[in-house]
């Protein structure tokens, strides 16, 4: 059975994410910073796994991020700034980073660096 390269990459990412989720869980004091990436956008949520609730969220679909000039990394940096601001407003200083099975580089690394620069600790 021959699969496309994109199908193989997707399955590999889901396997990596499943392995990661065995080890990573968020609490109310230290929620999980979940990253979801598509070809055009990036979405980030702070999730409390104990109650199953989303504490804060940010996305590149939001109006102030959509209007930015530049490539997708610039938007990822802005999304990182937004989620850090919203986390601080919710009284959160420390998070657990869940990269969602994506390799740590490019937009994911830019987002993580931006979150750290804006005051959240991993």
Curated annotation (Swiss-Prot):
Alphabetized SUPFAM superfamilies for the sequence: Translational machinery components
Gene Ontology terms describing biological process: translation
Keyword rRNA-binding listed: yes
GO cellular component: cytosolic large ribosomal subunit
GO MF term set: 5S rRNA binding; structural constituent of ribosome
HAMAP family assigned to the protein according to its UniProt record, in alphabetical order: Ribosomal_uL18_B
Subunit-level organization: Part of the 50S ribosomal subunit; part of the 5S rRNA/L5/L18/L25 subcomplex. Contacts the 5S and 23S rRNAs.
Protein name per UniProt: Large ribosomal subunit protein uL18
């Amino acid at each position: 059975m021959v699969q496309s390269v994109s199908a193989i990459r997707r399955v590999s990412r889901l396997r990596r994410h499943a392995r990661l989720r065995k080890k990573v869980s968020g609490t109310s004091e230290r929620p999980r910073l979940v990253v979801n990436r598509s070809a055009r956008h990036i979405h980030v949520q702070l999730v409390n796994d104990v109650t199953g609730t989303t504490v804060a969220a940010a996305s590149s679909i939001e109006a102030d991020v959509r209007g930015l000039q530049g490539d997708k990394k610039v938007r990822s940096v802005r999304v990182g700034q937004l989620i850090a601001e919203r986390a601080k407003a919710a009284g959160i200083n420390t998070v657990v980073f869940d990269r969602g099975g994506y390799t740590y580089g490019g937009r994911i690394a830019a987002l993580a660096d931006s979150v750290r620069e804006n005051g959240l600790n991993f």
